[in-house]
Amino acid sequence: PEPVPSRPTGSTPTVRPASGAGPQRVLLVDDSRSIRTLLKIYLMARSFEFLEAESAEEGLKVAEAEPVDLILTDFHMDGMNGADFAGQIRASANPKLSKVPILMMTGDPNVAEVRALGQKAGISAFVRKPVSCAQLMTLVDTILPLPRAAK
């Protein structure tokens, strides 16, 4: 099937339950449009539907309003960082949102410190940028298996 294009930031999406019928939904949270575009290209093989946010604060609003199956977030962003964002997702009163897998990425040279902050916040996986397509797909396949067909 053709990948579903992401909705432009600020547009009104059609709401559908995460993990229900249709493509799995991924929220991409990164202040770099080019990184968000690259991630979509890498993940096209899974036919995800993409939601995007340019900041952690915007990502929280989107995640609270829209059901998602996976969150990919950068660590370094203006305002709230990716670890604090992940911590707020984990603390959500919405039980489905609080359990959504979170993959945090960073280009920070202090990988051990950033990874520790992410793990303390409850991330599901961590990857250092630049990330290859194969590496990203392996991580995504590990934390978000393909949905099983109904029996």
Give the location of each predicted region:
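Charged docking surfaces used in two-component/phosphorelay signaling
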Residues: 37-45
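Helix N-cap/capping motif at the beta->alpha junctions
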Residues: 52-61, 82-84
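Active-site beta3 strand of CheY-like receiver
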Residues: 66-72
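Receiver (REC) domain active-site loop signature in two-component systems and cognate sites
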Residues: 77
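Alpha4 helix (beta4-alpha4-beta5 surface) of REC/receiver domains from two-component response regulators
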Residues: 84, 109-127, 138
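Hydrophobic/aromatic residues positioned on beta-strands within the core alpha/beta folds
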Residues: 105-106
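C-terminal output helix
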Residues: 131-140
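The C-terminal output helix
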Residues: 141-151
